[in-house]
Amino acid sequence: MQAGISVPRRLEIQRASTSTPNTERKNMDTNAIETMFGRIGARVRVSGAPHPRLAGIDIQTDRYGEFFDIKVGPEEQVGYEVIDLRPDMRHLLLMARRPNAKHKFLCGHDERHWFVCAIPGGSVSSVKAAIEALQPPEVRSAVRRRVKRVKDRLRRRNAAFVRQGEWFFVPVPELTVKETLILKNEPISRGNGSKSHVCQFAYRSGGEAVYVSTRYPLGLTRDAYSRLLKRNPSARSWAWRVMRRNAAVYIRGRVWHPDHKTIVLNEWHRVMMNTEGQALGARTVVFLD
């Protein structure tokens, strides 16, 4: 596998304007960052955001397809630096340097689509380390025990796990589950409005029951749900679904999602979410099923 290419090219963005493209180009070197993303076959657009809450990195789509959309808030001072580039993997590691913080993001292509993922850990400095940092401790432990070849540790499927998007599935061949406890076509979700992955067969243990609707995608506890209904009885009609927050979940059979290739698990696997939620640059995420 090709060695990583270190690219210490810093992109300073000082008080980026949201008025005109010419003003934006005066305040930032967009050509440099476009070149770096182009090395992995991606398009990127850097522009000003009209409001601070709209600032950040996202994936957008236009008539030419998907592209990385980097928006800088009004009066925001931030420098972007590509600190590792892996054209062979179609991945790069991007750092956003602010006066009081540094946030790192893995940008790349996974199966069918481009993605951006906030990375936990201040010492991460390479694409390989970023991918490993996204593995939960239980997954890393399983990798050390079961995967001997280093190059196999970052694959989507190896002896330690099967990965689909942000979810890791770790085999638990010794698990037996009563048929009456098995759920069918069960969704698992990060809980922040993202599209659910659907599991053909699932079994869950523990966790906290929460009430979820489109207005409360992160879920409400029973007490919070009851208080809401007392304040607003019409909320009862908001198409609520009872789900479990942070339960231990096991799945087998088919797992499908519109953005990923369907996988088939022939034995029970423990479900674990990646560690993006621990990153300073990530939005709040929870585990709902």
Please give the residue ranges for each predicted region:
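Subunit-assembly interface segments of extracellular/virion macromolecular structures
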Residues: 167-169
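Short Lys/Arg-enriched alpha/beta "domain-start" segment
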Residues: 28-87
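Acidic, aromatic-enriched beta-alpha/helix-loop junctions
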Residues: 71-86, 180-229
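N-terminal accessory interaction module
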Residues: 65-125
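Short acidic, Pro/Gly- and aromatic-enriched capping/linker segments at domain boundaries
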Residues: 138-163, 236-258
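Short, Lys/Arg-enriched N-terminal segments with co-localized hydrophobic residues
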Residues: 5, 9-27
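Short, surface-exposed, low-complexity cationic segments
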Residues: 173-202, 269-289
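Tight coil/turn sites that cap or link beta-strands
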Residues: 244-284
